[in-house]
């Protein structure tokens, strides 16, 4: 609905992926938790082989072996958390609806894909998973878990944490290769914020 979009999403944010592409509307969530407060709650990792391609092109620190420990660390995977490629103690719950909870349309689409020869995978986040699956979702007990819920809420009582409303991060600030802060736009003007560590 339009009211939802105006209140919780940036309706004038333009972006492009290449220099030649024309800028297009880029829907992103606004509010504490950003897009995780409004997205589809899918907990789907990037394909590990793609990270290895990035590393082969020079993206140091982005190989599958570099990123996998971070994927594992953030997860609390209710189904596969006890397996080597998943985590069970992170702040982000990962849930997959059992087939018994699927509706008739979902089941019909699943069967059509299987009949067309697409393989079934229990875990779309496994390295070799390609085909039909139950989407992994970041929800717990039927409730969305945003980055606000997972990271900020548990830290709200810390004396070194200040959450500013009506603040828009314009860009991340760097010293060499290290991110040191952010440039933000506040109602009173622009302001830079720097990390202590």
Model regions and ranges:
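Intrinsic-disorder/low-complexity regions
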Residues: 10-11, 159, 191
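Conserved redox-cofactor binding core of oxidoreductases
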Residues: 56-179, 185
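Extracellular/periplasmic catalytic domains that process cell-envelope and extracellular macromolecules
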Residues: 17-20, 24, 30-32, 85-87, ...
């Amino acid at each position: 609905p339009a009211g939802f979009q105006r209140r919780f999403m940036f309706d004038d944010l333009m972006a492009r992926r290449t220099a030649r592409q024309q800028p297009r509307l880029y829907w992103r969530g606004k509010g504490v938790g950003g897009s995780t407060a409004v997205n589809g709650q899918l907990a789907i990792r990037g394909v590990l082989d793609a990270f290895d391609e990035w590393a082969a092109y020079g993206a140091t620190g982005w190989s599958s072996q570099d990123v996998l420990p971070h994927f594992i660390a953030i997860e609390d995977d209710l189904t596969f958390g006890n397996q080597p490629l998943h985590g069970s103690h992170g702040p982000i719950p990962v849930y997959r609806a059992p087939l018994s909870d699927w509706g008739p349309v979902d089941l019909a689409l699943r069967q059509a894909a299987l009949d067309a020869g697409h393989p079934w995978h229990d875990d779309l986040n496994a390295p070799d998973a390609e085909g039909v699956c139950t989407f992994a979702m970041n929800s717990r007990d039927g409730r969305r878990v945003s980055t606000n819920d997972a990271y900020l809420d548990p830290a709200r009582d810390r004396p070194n944490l200040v959450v500013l409303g009506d603040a828009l991060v314009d860009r991340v600030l760097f010293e060499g290769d290290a991110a040191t802060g952010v440039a933000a736009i506040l109602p009173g003007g622009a302001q830079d914020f720097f990390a202590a560590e």
